[in-house]
A protein has these predicted regions:
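N-terminal presequence-like segments and the immediate start of the first folded domain
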Residues: 1-61, 65-70, 75-78, 84-133
Length: 133
């Protein structure tokens, strides 16, 4: 039997997200879908331009804020998809993820793409979370 669940939406940067037409995260039951995080300031301007490692750190920082809003950590992440405009540089810096995922790595995909929403963005990371009670 499927029970109805009311989605719970979360905006990290409400004005930016409304301008672009997305919600940063939505929780339904024990599952959370988190939109791709990019390296931006609160006004939506790209940060760490040209520095993929710092952009990656900024993505994880924003994702951590979303996870904490729902009482979760990176240990609850079950899917991580990474989109990057520079796969060789991402692969060279991917070891940073060892400081994020300390118990186990999630499933996911690493995809090299031609471009992201703004030309300055070099990486975008989206997550799916499952929180057991």
């Amino acid at each position: 039997e499927i029970k109805p669940e009311t989605p719970e939406y979360f905006y990290l940067r409400p004005e930016v997200e409304k301008a672009y037409g997305y919600t940063h995260a939505v929780k339904i039951g024990n599952d959370i879908k988190i939109s791709g995080a990019v390296s931006m300031d609160d006004a939506g301007n790209p940060t760490a331009v040209g520095d993929l490692l710092q952009q990656m750190k900024n993505c994880y920082s924003d994702l951590d804020k979303v996870l904490k809003h729902y009482g979760c950590t990176f240990d609850d992440v079950v899917v991580e998809n990474v989109f990057t405009t520079n796969m060789p540089e991402f692969l060279a810096q991917a070891g940073y993820r060892n400081s994020i995922y300390t118990k186990q790595f999630p499933t996911g995909s690493w995809l090299g793409v031609k471009e992201l929403a703004l030309p300055e963005f070099m990486i975008e990371i989206e997550l799916e979370v499952h929180k057991s009670h």
